[in-house]
UniProtKB/Swiss-Prot annotation:
GO terms for molecular function: ATP binding; ATP hydrolysis activity; ATP-dependent peptidase activity; sequence-specific DNA binding; serine-type endopeptidase activity; single-stranded DNA binding. PANTHER family: LON PROTEASE, LON PROTEASE HOMOLOG, MITOCHONDRIAL. Residues 714-737 have a biased composition (Polar residues). This is Lon protease homolog, mitochondrial. Residues 1-29 form a transit peptide. Residues 185-194 have a biased composition (Acidic residues). The gene is PIM1. It comes from the Eukaryota. ATP binds at residues 497-504. It comes from Candida glabrata (strain ATCC 2001 / BCRC 20586 / JCM 3761 / NBRC 0622 / NRRL Y-65 / CBS 138).
Amino acid sequence: MLGTRVTRAVYTRAPLKLQLRALGLHRRYVHNGSKNDEGSSTSTTTNKEENDKKLPDVYPQMLALPISRRPLFPGFYKAVVISEPRVMKAITDMVERQQPYIGAFMLKDSNNDTDIIHDISEVHELGVLAQVTSAFPSKDEKTGKETMTALLYPHKRIKIDQLIPPKDVKIEDIVVEKVVDNEVASEETKDEETVDKTESATDKVSEEITEEIAKAPSTEVTEDPDNYENPTDFLKDYNVTLVNVSNLEDEPFDIKSPIINALTSEILKVFKEISQLNSMFREQIATFSASIQSATTNIFEEPAKLADFAAAVSAGEEEELQEVLESLNIEQRLEKSLLVLKKELMNAELQNKISKDVETKIQKRQKEYYLMEQLKGIKRELGIDDGRDKLVDTYKKRVEKLNLPENVQKTFDEEITKLATLETSMSEFGVIRNYLDWLTSLPWGINSKEQYSIPRARKILDEDHYGMKDVKDRILEFIAVGKLLGKVDGKIICFVGPPGVGKTSIGKSISRALNRQFFRFSVGGMTDVAEIKGHRRTYIGALPGRIIQALKKCQTQNPLILIDEIDKIGHGGIHGDPSAALLEVLDPEQNNSFLDNYLDIPIDLSKVLFVCTANSLDTIPRPLLDRMEVIELTGYVAEDKIKIAEQYLVPSAKKTAGLQNATVSMDEEAINALMKYYCRESGVRNLKKHIEKIYRKAALEVVKKMSIEDTEPLVSTSEEPQLSQTNQNISSSSAEDSTTDLEDSVNPDTAKEASKPNNSQEGASVEETKKAVKTEEEEDTSMIVPEDIKVEITPEDLKKYVGPPIYTTDRLYETTPPGVIMGLAWTNMGGCSLYVESVLEQPLHNCKHANLERTGQLGDVMKESSRLAYSFSKMYLSKKFPENRFFEKAAIHLHCPEGATPKDGPSAGVTMATSFLSLALNKPVDPTVAMTGELTLTGKVLRIGGLREKVVAAKRSGAKTVIFPKDNLNDWEELPENVKEGMEPLAADWYDDIYKRLFSGVKKSEGNNVWKSEFELIDKKKKEND
C-alpha cells in the first residue's frame, strides 16, 4: 500500500495501524454480538459485562443521532422516532451489515426536532454509545409522514472529538498526510483504492489528490487488504452526520465512602416512597433490583448504576438530566440524581393528591346520583311524583344552550340545588321557579349579527323617512365605526323635536338598518323606580324591570331599546325617582354591570343601542342629559310636507281605506291647500289624520256610487284572499301595542304573515278562533272598484271632506298697523310666529302720565325684556329724534296674542323695541318681516337658540325677511337650502342694523313732528290750567 494517505482532517483519529486493528476488532465484535440484537428490553449486568468485553477501546467513525428533550443513560433502553429519510436508510443498512452502533447526543434546543447535526454547538458534546437493537417503520399520525422507530440500548458514555457534518467537501477541509510505515508495502494501485472518491468536493480537488498520490513513494502491503477496510465507510454514501469519539470512564471512588453510602441510602429511601405512590415506578424498581441482584447482592457496590437509574426513570428538566450524564464523579452524580428524584417525589405526591381529590368528588357525585335515583324510585312507587325532576331537567337543558358567565352559572347552580330540595307546596318553591324562568330566558351570549352595509342602511332609512339628514348621517357613522373596529358597542342617543316629526318611527328604521331587534317602552308619567330596576323577588308578584323584559323579548344582548317620552318622566314620587335609576342604564361606564333588583346579578348592557325621544330638554335632569348624545329634529317646511305626504302618507292612507285598487287621487295642490289652511304645525301627525279622514270619506263616496249603479261586489281573483278591513285594523292596532319584531320588518313574507289576525283570542279556543277568522274571510272579501268610478280630490273639495278651513290667511296680519311686529318663538311643538302688539291706551292729550301695561301671560323673563325694551326705546328715540316727546305722555299697552298660552324667554327683546319705536314714529313695519333676538340696554343684539325652528315657522307664516343676531349666522348657513329658499336674512349686531332696515324712510323732520299737534294741544291745556 502507498505510504502517503489523503483524507479529511477530521477523520484523522490515530495512526493507520491502530485504526486498522480497531476496525478488525470492531468487525469481530459485531459478528459475535449480532445474536443479542433481539434481546429483552431489560438490561442485565451479565449481558452488560459480556457486551463490555466485546466493545473495542477505539471506534471508527459512527453515525451521530441527535436526541431531543432528555438524554440516554447507559444500561436503559429508549425508543426514538426518526423522520429523516437519509438517517432511516443509513440505520437500516447498518442493521443489515451488523454494524448497529451510533452516538446519541442530546440537543441543546428542545424545540429543534431534527435528525441531522450541522454544527457541534447544536448538541451537548457528551453522550452515549448506543446499539440499535431493533428498527421498524412507523407513521406520523399528524402529518402522515413515513418515519422509523428505533430501540436503542446505551452502553457507555462517550465524548465528541470531531464532528463531520453532512456538507459538501470544501478545499480547506482537504489535507495531504504522509504516513511512513515499514510494515506496509508500496504499491500505487493499492493506494488508489484507499482513496474515497465519494468524498471529493469538486473535480479540481480530485485532480490535486491524484497528482499527490502519484508523487508518493511506493511500499508493499504484507497483510490481507480486507483487514484494512473501514466497516463504516458505507455511511458516507448517505450524507449523514458522522463523529469521531472517545470513551469516558467514571472517576475512581471508594465503595466504603460514608457520603456515597448516605446518598445511596437516601436515593433508596426516596425510591421506596415513590413506589408507594406510583405503581409504574414500583415495576421499574423491581426490574432494576432483579438485574442488580443477578450480578451482586449488595446495591451499595453499584452506586453509579443506581444514579443512572434514578435519572433515567425521573421526569426532570433537560439540563438537570444532562448534568447527571456528564458527571463522572460518582458522588456528584448521586447528589444530582437525588435532586432530580426528590422533585419526582414531589410531583408524585401532588399527582396522588389530585387523584384522591378527583376520586372523592366522583364518589360523592356517584353517591348523590345513586341516592337520587333511589328517591325517584320510591316516589314513583308511592305515587307522589311532583314533576320537580322534569322541571330541573328543563332548566338544565336551557342552560346548556346558553353561554352563562361564571358568576351567573354559580347562581344558577345554587338556585337549582335549592329547587331540587324544596317541596312544591312551599311558597319559596314558586319564587325560585319564577326566578329560574327569568334567569334561563335571558339571551346570555346571544347576539344578532351586525349589519355593516352602508348602502343597505341608507336605503332602509330613505324608504321609511324623508329628510332627517343629521339622524341618518349619525347612524351611518355608527355603522362605519363598527365596520372598522369589527364590533359595535352600545350608544345612547336622544332625539329632540316637536311632535309628529318621526322620532319614534325613525327608531324602528334604525333597528332594521342595523339588523337589530327592536323594543319600545314609554317612561312618560312613570313614577316607580321598580319599573326600571325591578322589584325584590321576595315580594309577591315581583318582576324584573323593563330593561330585563326587553332583553327577554328580543332574545339578543344587542337590541335597540327605544325609551319614549323621556322628558315627561315623573319626579319625586313616593316610590323613588325613575330618572335617577336611568342614570345607571344610560351611562356607558356603568351599564356593563347593570344590577336589576329582581335578578340581583350584573347584566351587561354595553352592547345595547339606547334611543331616547323627547320634545324638550328643559325637563330632563342635567346628569341624565349629559349621558346622552342629543340630535335635534326640526319641524318640516311646506316642501318637506308635500314630499312626505306624496311618498308616505297618501299611499298608506289609501291602502288603509281599501282604495289601493280604486281610482282615487289627491293632487299636489290639494295637499298644499290642506297644509296651508288646516295643518300648519311642525310635524306631520295632524296632516296624516286629515289625509286618512279624506280617504275614508272618499271610500264612502265610492261605495255609494257602486250601490247606486247596482254593481255587484266581485270576489277578488288574486291567489291570496285579503282579510277584511276590520281584521286589518285589529292587526295593526295590536301590532302598535306590542313590540315590533325586527325579522318581520326585514322579511316581507314574515311581515305579511304577522299582519294576519292573531289566532289566540281571549275567551275562545283555537278551533273557534280559526272558524271565526275563516267565516270573516269568506264574508268580507275585498271588492274590485270599476274603472269608471273615479274620485279626484281638489282644493275646492277639502271643505266637503275635512270641514271649513282653520286658517284663512297665511299671517295673522296681512297688513300690520303701527306697533304690531311679527316675532318668532320656540316651543315644544316647534317654532311659531308670535306677534307683539303695542297701542296707545288713549290719545296723548288725555294721558295724565306715561306708563306701560303688559298682558298675554308673559313670564318673568319676558316682562323684564319688555321693561328693558321700553327703556331702550325711550333712549333711542331721544337720540334719533330729540323733539319727539312721545314717551313723556304715552300710556302704552303691550300684548302678545293667544293669551291662554304662557310665554317666556329673552329672545323677544328686539321685537318689543321695534314695536315701541313703530308706535312712537307712527310707522307700520313690513308685514313680511319676522325677527328674533335678545336686546341689551345699549342696543347690542345677543345670540338666541332654536333658529332653525324659528326660520321654519317664519317661512310657514309667509315671511320673506328674517332678522336674527349676527352670532347666529353660522346656524343660518347650516340650514338646508329648501328652508332658506325665498328668505332674506339680516344678521344684526346692533339695533342700528335693524332700524336702518325697517325705518330708513323716516326723515328727521318727520320723526320729530309726528306727534307735534298732540303736544301743542297738551301745552295749550297746560297754559289754560295755569
